C-alpha cells in the first residue's frame, strides 16, 4: 500500500492538482478516517488508534480532496466521516467508543450460521425486479447535471424524487409516507420513505443509499457529475425494490428507505440520522447500504461483501439470502473506514451490511468524474441482483423475529 500511496503523490506532483469550486472552500474539517491515509495527505493528527488504523484528523478541503482521490487510486471509496462540532473536543474518547462498539458488534460473529427457509412468495416478489426498468431509473437520476450537496441548488433532484415516489407507490398494499429531512451539516436534504409495521412498528429495518454525486476529476467540466454508478445505481435499486414490494403485504416491522444527503462530503446526512436514532433509543434491527452496484469489475454476479465496520450477523443473513434466492458469488473484501453510509450506523452501535459491485480493487474507476455515465462497461443484469437483495432484506427481516444475538 505504501508504494501505491507514493505513486499517487508522484502522479499529483507531475500533473498538478486542478481543483474546482465544488472541491475547495475556506473551511477545514475535522474528520474520522484511516490513519495511514491521513498521514499520507499531511493531515494534523488529533488522536489515533493504530490497532484500528483510525485517526481523528484536521484536514483542509484540498487535503480532503486528495484523500478521496488517494482512496480511489488504492481501489477504495472516499473513506472519511466529517465530525460534528460536539464530537471534536475529545477525539481520543471518540476513538475509544468506536473501538468498543466495533468489538461488541463483531462479537456477534461467534453466533451460528443463519439458514433461511425458502419462501415461494418472496422469490416471486424478488423476480418482479426488472433490469430494463432499473436502467430507465438510473438514466433518469443521472440526467441531472450534478447532485452535489454544495451546489447552488442542491435539492432539485431531491424534491423530484419525493414527487416520483408518491406517484410510483400508488396502488401499494400498505400505507406509506415520504418526507424530506433537513440537516445541520449540509443544505441538501435526505429523502425518507416509511412503511409502518403492522404488528411491531417500533422495530425498524433500514435500507439506504446516498443520492448525491461529486466530480473530483483533474480535467473537463467540473460542474458535470452524473454519478450513474456512484450512486444513481444504489438509489435506483431501492426505488425498484419498492416497486416490487408494492405487491407484498404490509410488513410486520417498520421499513425505512433513505436516499441520503452529502455522503461524498463525509457521510453528512446519514451521520445525523444515525446519531438521532441512537439519541432517541430507536430500535433499528438492521441496516442495508447500497452504494455502487453497476460495474461488474470482478465478473458478472460476483459481489463484494464488505467485512470491515459491518455486522457479522447481518453478513451471515445476507449470505443466506443470497444462497437461498439470488445465487450470486459473494467475495469477502474490505473498504476501510467511512467508505459509505453504513459506517454512520455502525459507529452508533447498529448492525449494518453493504454488498458492493465488485471487490474494491476492481471497482469502477470512472466514478467522481464526468465519465460516470451509462455505457457498455456497466451491467444492469448484475445490478439487478442488488435490487433483489433489497427486496429480500425487507421481506426476510421485515417479517421475522430475527435480531442480533446478545452475549
Residue locations for each model-derived region?
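Solvent-exposed loop/turn segments at secondary-structure junctions
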Residues: 146-149, 183-187, 197-200, 211-215, ...
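Acidic/histidine-rich catalytic neighborhood of metal-dependent amide-processing enzymes
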Residues: 187-189, 221-313, 317, 338, ...
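Structural recognition of the beta-strand scaffold that forms the well-ordered cores
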Residues: 134-142, 190-194, 204-208, 227, ...
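Second-shell loop/turn segments in exported
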Residues: 120-129, 142-155, 179-181, 220-231, ...
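A non-catalytic alpha/beta surface segment that caps or lines the substrate-entry region
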Residues: 136-196
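Active-site-adjacent substrate-binding region
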Residues: 299-407
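N-terminal hydrophobic or amphipathic helices/low-complexity stretches enriched
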Residues: 94-151, 406-407
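N-terminal accessory interaction module
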Residues: 22-103
Amino acid at each position: 500500500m505504501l508504494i501505491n500511496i507514493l505513486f499517487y503523490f508522484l502522479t499529483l506532483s507531475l500533473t498538478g492538482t486542478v481543483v474546482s469550486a465544488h472541491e475547495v472552500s475556506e473551511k477545514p474539517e475535522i474528520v474520522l478516517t484511516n490513519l495511514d491515509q491521513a498521514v499520507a495527505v499531511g493531515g494534523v493528527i488529533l488522536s489515533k488508534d493504530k490497532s484500528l488504523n483510525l485517526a481523528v484528523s484536521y484536514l483542509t478541503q484540498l487535503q480532503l480532496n486528495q484523500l478521496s482521490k488517494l482512496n480511489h487510486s488504492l481501489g477504495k471509496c472516499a473513506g472519511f466521516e466529517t465530525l460534528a462540532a460536539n464530537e471534536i473536543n475529545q477525539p481520543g474518547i471518540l476513538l475509544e467508543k468506536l473501538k468498543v462498539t466495533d468489538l461488541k458488534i463483531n462479537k456477534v460473529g461467534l453466533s451460528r450460521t443463519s439458514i433461511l427457509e425458502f419462501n415461494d412468495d418472496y422469490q416471486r416478489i424478488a423476480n418482479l425486479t426488472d433490469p430494463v426498468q432499473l436502467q430507465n431509473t438510473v438514466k433518469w437520476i443521472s440526467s441531472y447535471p450534478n447532485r452535489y450537496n454544495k451546489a447552488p441548488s442542491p435539492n432539485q433532484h431531491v424534491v423530484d424524487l419525493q414527487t416520483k415516489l408518491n406517484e410510483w407507490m400508488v396502488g401499494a398494499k400498505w400505507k406509506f409516507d415520504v418526507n424530506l429531512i433537513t440537516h445541520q451539516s449540509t443544505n441538501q436534504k435526505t429523502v425518507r420513505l416509511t412503511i409502518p409495521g403492522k404488528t411491531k412498528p417500533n422495530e425498524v429495518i433500514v435500507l439506504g443509499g446516498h443520492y448525491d454525486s461529486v466530480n473530483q476529476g483533474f480535467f473537463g467540466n467540473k460542474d458535470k457529475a452524473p454519478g450513474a454508478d456512484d450512486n444513481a445505481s444504489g438509489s435506483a435499486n431501492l426505488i425498484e425494490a419498492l416497486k416490487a414490494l408494492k405487491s407484498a403485504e404490509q410488513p410486520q416491522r417498520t421499513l425505512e428507505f433513505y436516499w441520503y444527503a452529502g455522503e461524498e462530503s463525509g457521510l453528512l446526512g446519514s451521520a445525523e440520522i444515525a446519531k438521532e436514532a441512537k439519541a432517541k433509543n430507536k430500535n433499528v434491527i438492521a441496516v442495508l447500504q447500497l452504494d455502487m452496484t453497476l460495474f461488474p469489475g470482478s465478473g458478472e454476479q460476483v459481489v463484494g461483501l464488505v467485512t470491515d465496520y459491518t455486522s457479522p450477523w447481518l453478513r451471515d443473513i445476507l449470505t443466506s439470502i443470497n444462497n437461498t434466492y439470488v445465487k450470486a458469488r459473494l467475495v469477502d473484501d474490505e473498504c476501510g473506514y467511512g467508505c459509505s453510509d453504513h459506517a454512520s450506523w455502525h459507529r452508533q452501535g447498529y448492525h449494518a451490511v453493504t454488498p458492493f459491485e465488485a471487490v474494491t480493487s476492481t471497482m469502477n474507476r470512472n466514478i467522481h468524474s464526468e465519465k460516470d455515465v451509462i455505457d457498455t462497461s456497466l451491467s444492469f443484469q448484475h445490478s439487478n441482483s442488488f435490487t433483489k437483495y433489497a427486496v429480500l432484506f425487507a421481506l426476510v427481516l421485515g417479517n421475522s423475529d430475527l435480531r442480533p444475538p446478545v452475549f
